[in-house]
Amino acid sequence: MLKVYANVIHPGKGLADALRPLCHEAVSTDGGDNSVTEKDGMVLLSFVGIYFPWEEAAGAIRSHITKDSTGKMDVLDMENWRITRFFIKDGTVTSRSGSLNNALDYNGF
């Protein structure tokens, strides 16, 4: 099972439109709240399910950020007990991965 959550503040134009098709490719669980929303200058992504093309989502985010964009995307792989966090800051996207046992280490770095 995967859980993917993202928030991008001040994204470049078109980010939500780039992420929405990825939700349609995803394989979710029954009752999963899978959505991409735009609100008050922020794009939010929420997914819970079996498969989500998170590498493509990271690529879409990289393609649609500006120097003013900030935020993060968390990919929680429950089967392999891993977390990957993408950091969005200063026009770049970086990431770190580790065990979910150390998830608190990923809160803020």
Regions found by a protein language model. Name each.
Residues 1-26:
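Short, extreme N-terminal segment that most often corresponds to the first beta-strand
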Residues 22-109:
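Charged interaction segments
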